[in-house]
Structure formats: C-alpha cells, structure tokens
Amino acid sequence: MFLLNASRLGAGSRLFSSAGVQFAKKRGQAAKEAVEVDLVDVGDYVKKATERFQHTVELHKKRLGQMKAGKPDATMFDGLAVGNEKQKFTELAATSVKGKNMLIVTVFDPKDTKRVASAIVGAGLNVTTERVLENQQQLKISLPPVTTETRERLCRDMKKVFEEYKNSANRHSLGHVRSEVLKELKKLDKKNDSVRKVIQEIENLHKEYTAMLQEQLKHAEKNAMR
C-alpha cells in the first residue's frame, strides 16, 4: 500500500526580510495555519485499474466467441440497438436456432417487426432476412455458406473488435480505462515517489492486458480459419 501526503497547507511558505529568508512563523500564526494532511491510498488505483482491465478482457473474449463463420448463434443479435430510440434487441424479440444455417427471430409485438428487421439488416452481419408469411411476428434469418472468403472477412471483423477494445472511445477499451486512471493519478503530486511508482505500474498493467487481448484475437482467428 502506498500512502501519499496529498497536500500541506502552510508548508513551503516563505517570509522575506532584510535578514534573508525565514522559514518560521510566530506561534499564533502556526497554530492558526496548521498543516492539513490528506492520506490517499494510491495503491487503490492499481486495484481499480486491474479490475477494469480484467473486465475488458472478459468482454472482448465473449464478443469474439460470438463471432462464428456460418454457425447459427441465438445470441448474435442480442447486442443490437433497434430504431431511433436505441431499444435493446432482447426487449423486443427472441432468437432461436433452426437447422444448420438458419435462425428464427420472434418479435413480441407485431408493430415492431419492421424495426427489428431493419436493425438486423443494418448491422452488416451478411445475413438474409425475410418475414415468415404465415406469422407476421417472425423473421427467418439465413446465414451465408462458409467459404474462405467469409472466414477471411470474419477475421477482419474480429480485428475491428480487437481495436475497439484495445483503444477507442468505448468506455471499456483498455486505452480509455488507462487514460481515466492516469488522469486521476496526475491530479496528485507527480513528484512523489509513490505516485510515480503507481503510474509506472498502471502502464505495465496496460501492456500486459493488451497482450492478453492480442492472444485472444490470435486464438479466435485460428479457430475461424479451420
């Protein structure tokens, strides 16, 4: 645990006189302007950063795991936002697997079917969407056949996901987390040894977790090309 003397009121004050620089105050002034000490556990910043970095790695792994070439996945639309209201897909519809390359989306309210279909088409997932004629609340989603081209496209999409979680405006990206933590640390006394050590530790953690993301991407790409 690192303890930082964050601020001292009255410390470092200078009194100039014809006799030179004086570093003492009268007892009455000293009592009035007592030193205020704030103890800050800067080591806690390491703990918080580690927790947030770990959460990012878990989200990245889950996201890559959902990206499977040609394999139907009932959760593939769960992250979509529907309409201008940006409603969660899961609040409006449910998805089930049918056969080797098909999904059935059941919309809870018929009036939302068109909006849900538009969200799926607009997501750029390279799927074919059509209404089930006998049921206006259902959409039939056909997945494309798996080819070398689709596998390579999947790998490119995975790389985009990697970049998003590595360094982007996404509040879960490693870069965003690093910037927020360092911003808070630099409000403290950067000349203090404890603060400098913690800043360096945050930088080292950032590098370690970036390497973890790279390993996850490498593993996902390998599976995609099989």
From Swiss-Prot:
Alphabetized UniProt keyword annotations: Mitochondrion, Protein biosynthesis, Transit peptide
Major subcellular site: mitochondrion
GO cellular component: mitochondrion
Gene3D superfamilies: 3.30.1360.40, Ribosome-recycling factor (1.10.132.20)
One GO-annotated biological process of the protein: mitochondrial translation
Intracellular or extracellular location(s): Mitochondrion
Alphabetical list of Pfam families matching this protein: RRF
Entry keyword annotation includes Disulfide bond: no
GO terms assigned for molecular function: ribosomal large subunit binding
Family listed: Belongs to the RRF family.
Annotated function: Necessary for protein synthesis in mitochondria. Functions as a ribosome recycling factor in mitochondria.
Identification of the protein by name: Ribosome-recycling factor, mitochondrial
Originating organism: Eremothecium gossypii (strain ATCC 10895 / CBS 109.51 / FGSC 9923 / NRRL Y-1056)
